[in-house]
Amino acid sequence: MLETTMGEASPEDPPLNLKSLSQPPQKRSRTVEDFNRFCSFVLAYAGYIPPPAKEERAWTPPSSVSPHRTEESDGWDSPDPPQLPIPSDPRQPPASSDISTIETFVMKAKSQGGGGGNSENVEGPVGSGEQAQVKKGSRRKRRQRHRGGVTMSDTDTDEEERGERLAGSLPAPQLPPSAESSRDGGGSSSDADTQVMDEDIMVESGDDSWDLVTCYCEKPFAGRPMIECNICCTWVHLSCAKIRKSNVPDVYYCQKCRGGKGSGGTAPKGEP
């Protein structure tokens, strides 16, 4: 029973010959190079680009064995590598089905007039040319503006230089006589101060007169400004005589000589 069941084929199973015939033949997988070649052929057929150069015709498939590999294989006596299916020669014209698909593709591209990808490729150079013209025009405008700005800046600098020259050529404003007199008074006071300071500088701390006591305040000279009495020839500090450095009199009498002069004492020095 088992032999009969195993030997007999079920009516539902199709025969083996039909299975082998129904399966389609295995096709070679498409690559990026095949797609690029197809696109270039379509564009060349439509007249958008020139036909491929001779270098593309001399293209060799990547599956071909290089001479270095053949030398290595001959040296090592290795068995021949398995031969891969060689792609069809690009110089051969495509089949009728491919031509029909290409024609339909080109007709669709022409009918759309700008919606397809090929129309973009066609309009690309034109649009790029217009954009280039627009960019050139904008650059020219910018250059003109820049030149105008430079000229304006040059004129501004020239005007500034002219203004400075005019300001330098104008005479200085004349001050009123009161201001000049005040300046003169200040100059005389400054001269007196410089004289007193010169006298102070002339006496150093190591000098013998530094510790000399001549004033009625019984304090040493110590480099402070002093004035001499015209009668008794006594040196008195300006601070003790209540005299400012800016207003030093030419003739000075100390307090003692003033009192003696009022009571009919000796005549002052230099008087008859």
Curated annotation (Swiss-Prot):
Instruction: Write down the Gene3D superfamilies for this protein, in alphabetical order.
Output: Zinc/RING finger domain, C3HC4 (zinc finger)
Per the UniProt entry, what is one GO biological process?
autophagy
Q: Which organism is it from?
A: Xenopus laevis (African clawed frog)
The domain-related comment in the record is:
The PHD-type zinc-finger domain is required for negative regulation of autophagy.
Pfam families assigned to the protein according to its UniProt record, in alphabetical order: PHD
Keyword Secreted (UniProt): no
Q: Where in the cell is it found?
A: Nucleus; Cytoplasm
Annotated stretches, region: Disordered: 1-31, 50-193
SUPFAM superfamilies reported for this sequence? FYVE/PHD zinc finger
| Keyword Zinc-finger annotated | yes
Q: What's an example GO cellular component term for this entry?
A: nucleus
The record places its PHD-type zinc fingers at: 212-260
What does the UniProt record say this protein does?
Answer: Acts as a negative regulator of autophagy.
Q: Which gene encodes it?
A: phf23-a
Identification of the protein by name? PHD finger protein 23A
